[in-house]
C-alpha cells in the first residue's frame, strides 16, 4: 500500500478504533434551527429559507461539523442538517441492527418526500458522501445535484494491495472482524493519548483535531462498528453511470500526503464512470477539510449550492 493510499485509509477508518459511548446532548448548530425531527435511523433539524440543501456528516460525526457554513448558507437556502442516530451521544434507535445505511437512505427519502424537497442539493462528507450516492441510485428524483466531500464509491479500494481488484466478498471477512472488534469497545475507557494517536491524520489544524476528538468520543461504537462494516462492503462503482445528477467531488491535499499531484489522479480514477462530474480541490487540509479550511470550503459549498 503506498503512502497516499495509507493516509486515505487512516482518514476514512482511523476514528473507528476510538469511539466510546458518552450519552449526552448534541451541540446546537451555529444558526437558529427548527426543532429536531427524530426518525428510526436519523434526526433532522433545519435552518434558513430558500432552495433546499441537505448536509450529511460522516462516520461518528455530528451535524455540528457544518457549524462553520450553516449561518452563511442559511441566508439563501433551507438547510437540512442530518445526524445519524448513535452519533453525538444520541440514542442509537434502530441503528443497532444491520442495514443502517439503507435505513438512512429510506429515512432521507421519506423526509424529502414529506417536506416536498425533491431535487435538493445534497452534500455528504465521507460516509455521508456514500449515502448521497446511495440516495441518488435508489431515489434519483430526490437529488438535483450532489457534492461528495472526500468520499469514494467503494471505500475498500483503500485496503487493496497494488494490482489487486478488490471485491466486497474479498473484504467482508476482514470487515466483519473489524466490526466485532470495534463493537466490543463499547463502554470501555480510552486515554487521551490513545485517542490522539488513532485520530492522527484526520485533520491538520489544532482546533480541528480538538473538535474531531471530542465528537468521536461521543459516538456509540456499536453503531460505528456496523456502519464501518457496511461502508466497506458497499460497492457503488458499477452504479456511477446511472447517477444522472451532476456530481461535484471535493477533495483535500497538503504538503505531506496526499499531495495535490497524488490526489487529483486518484479521485478522477474513482469517479471516471460518472457521466457528469466535476472536481474541486482544497489545499492545506486533511479529511475534515471543512474544519481545516473553513473559508475555502464555504466558498466551494456556496458556489455549489447556487
Residues of each region from the PLM?
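Alpha/beta-hydrolase fold catalytic core
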Residues: 2-54, 74-78, 117-118, 275-278, ...
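Conserved HGGG/HGGXW glycine-rich cap/lid loop of the alpha/beta-hydrolase fold
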Residues: 40, 45-94
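Conserved hydrolase catalytic core segment
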Residues: 118-160
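Conserved alpha/beta-hydrolase catalytic His-Asp/Glu region
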Residues: 157-163, 181-241
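Conserved loop-alpha-helix segment in the C-terminal half of the alpha/beta-hydrolase fold
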Residues: 246-285
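Catalytic histidine-centered segment of alpha/beta-hydrolase-like enzymes
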Residues: 285-294, 298
